[in-house]
Amino acid sequence: MLDKLDRLEEEYRELEALLSDPEVLKDKGRYQSLSRRYAEMGEVIGLIREYRKVLEDLEQAESLLDDPELKEMAKAEREALLARKEALEKELERHLLPKDPMDERDAIVEIRAGTGGEEAALFARDLFNMYLRFAEEMGFETEVLDSHPTDLGGFSKVVFEVRGPGAYGTFKYESGVHRVQRVPVTETQGRIHTSTATVAVLPKAEEEDFALNMDEIRIDVMRASGPGGQGVNTTDSAVRVVHLPTGIMVTCQDSRSQIKNREKALMILRSRLLEMKRAEEAERLRKTRLAQIGTGERSEKIRTYNFPQSRVTDHRIGFTTHDLEGVLSGHLTPILEALKRADQERQLAALAEG
């Protein structure tokens, strides 16, 4: 393990040097990427330095065990240092877990209204706004790729891109069924209803990831539609792309340009096909007990937003907060950090089982 720690410290020193390099400072994109990596490494570097200090202190304590006058004190100190050493090793193991190479990619996020009619569409809008605020808080850029608004201002479906280093790794734990419990605006009796929305998060695929065979793709053009199915455009700018071998269908209508909608639709299709390929590989690995996925199945109910109790519960890890307003305002970091830690613990357990 010490060799890995040496390499991390060397990388950290190299990053420090690069961040003060005038050429790097001129390149905003590269500077931001290096700064993010430097900030990410801060915690593990602190742990490494503490670990090395514990090893030094442990060596010193053991050298005093033969001294009759200091033996008892050295013995007590040695026990405390051994306990701290073990705790630090567990923390470092977590940081040294292999990262998903897709984590640094941009993300495609799709939110679909589920059961609950118009209330589900309004909940989909709430989730969309929550993610936009969270993305802004994290320094990511967002762009709506496709949206289908409803009469009361909700969304039956909305797809958007999150751009920035680590976007997919940040958002991936949001995949699954989200449930809301509240009194809908359409409810006249004051009864609490339960509605759902499904979130899918995909790593953005690059052209080299998945070569699309255009002979296997059907592209239809149509007029964009608004709430209630009414036309909002007098030109055929909306695009529907169908991947014939899998039946995957993607529509895009947010741009007035048919060409831009076509490009966006193909990009989403490529990302879905890449995710399908990744899911098949993950299933194969899971069956052979070589890996586990901690991001939740899409059919699984992952989180409940209970308005009467101002409570948010993530069912995957039993995490509960009563700051519903804060969560919907985009303060997702405590939940996502807890999910990330639980995922790492599962990976460590899987490695321990061999």
Curated annotation (Swiss-Prot):
**Posttranslational modification, per the record?**
Methylated by PrmC. Methylation increases the termination efficiency of RF1.
Listed InterPro entries: PCRF (IPR005139), Pep_chain_release_fac_I (IPR000352), Pep_chain_release_fac_I_sf (IPR045853), Prokaryotic/Mito_RF (IPR050057), RF-1 (IPR004373)
Q: Provide the alphabetized UniProt keywords.
A: Cytoplasm, Methylation, Protein biosynthesis
Q: Cellular component GO terms, alphabetically? A: cytoplasm
Superkingdom of origin organism? Bacteria
Would the keyword Protein biosynthesis turn up in this protein's UniProt record? yes
Q: Which residues carry this modification: N5-methylglutamine?
A: Q230
Q: Report a single Gene Ontology molecular function.
A: translation release factor activity, codon specific
Give a yes or no for keyword Cytoplasm in this entry: yes
Tell me the compartments it is located in.
Answer: Cytoplasm
* PROSITE patterns recorded: RF_PROK_I
Q: Which family does it belong to?
A: Belongs to the prokaryotic/mitochondrial release factor family.
What exactly does this protein do?
A: Peptide chain release factor 1 directs the termination of translation in response to the peptide chain termination codons UAG and UAA.
**Name of the protein described by the UniProt record:** Peptide chain release factor 1
Question: Which source organism?
Answer: Thermus thermophilus (strain ATCC BAA-163 / DSM 7039 / HB27)
